[in-house]
Amino acid sequence: MHNVDQQELSKFEQMAHSWWDPNGSFKPIHLLNPLRFNYIQTKANGLFGKKVLDVGCGGGILSEAMAQAGAIVTGIDMTTEPLEIAKQHAIENGLTIHYQQTTVEDLRLNHTACNAEKFDVVTCMEMLEHVPDPLSVIQSCKALLKPDGVLFLSTINRTLKAYMLVVIGAEYLLKMLPKGTHEFEKFIKPAELLTWCDQASLECKEMKGYHFNPLTEKFWLNNDVSCNYIAMLKAK
């Protein structure tokens, strides 16, 4: 199976039952989602009526927010149980989201074969650090993007600070995430991400860091990318 880590998939399969529990295993994503959604919507100049691809959509937290904003959303993931939960949750909330169990590489091949319309916006949030070949994902995201489209990538910097906050802090001390959710050696430095994006003929227009206050349980953005960060990219 191309560019899939079965151990990584099994982690998320095991946590799937609590995907939509705001106080469960995915509490950090529920807390982060309004910030990242607003950033994406603003930088994409609105989402209404736009064709959007959410790569690594999991249980559909971001996909649903974008669909509620009027986007025509396709969500893809290689997990089974989280995708079923995503489909059911969308139905319960009266949302039309096209969920598919596929890799972005295979979706790219199918789109090319069918000469299908490309996407105005592609998002790949907190997924690159969970796949064997991040460059392959980025290249396929670029191939599925319209010439004037916008790609959003988010991941975690490979720094001591990120290790202390994301692994030790979030997984072991605050217990906001199950232990073993992240592997430090898979974290991605911004320079590495930018090199891959350059190889995929993508230009970074902006990069911002996510930051979290555990006392207020609030996230905010600034220019410090030493931990979690998001990049906005366009085709060269």
Swiss-Prot record:
Query: Which transformation does this protein catalyse, written as a reaction?
Result: a 3-demethylubiquinol + S-adenosyl-L-methionine = a ubiquinol + S-adenosyl-L-homocysteine + H(+); a 3-(all-trans-polyprenyl)benzene-1,2-diol + S-adenosyl-L-methionine = a 2-methoxy-6-(all-trans-polyprenyl)phenol + S-adenosyl-L-homocysteine + H(+)
Please indicate which superkingdom the organism of origin belongs to.
Bacteria
Q: Which Pfam families match?
A: Methyltransf_23
Q: Which cysteines are joined by disulfide bonds?
A: none
Pathway assignment reads: Cofactor biosynthesis; ubiquinone biosynthesis
User: E.C. number, please?
Assistant: 2.1.1.222, 2.1.1.64
Q: Which family does it belong to?
A: Belongs to the methyltransferase superfamily. UbiG/COQ3 family.
> What this chain does, per the record?
O-methyltransferase that catalyzes the 2 O-methylation steps in the ubiquinone biosynthetic pathway.
How is this protein named in the record?
Ubiquinone biosynthesis O-methyltransferase
Q: Which source organism?
A: Haemophilus ducreyi (strain 35000HP / ATCC 700724)
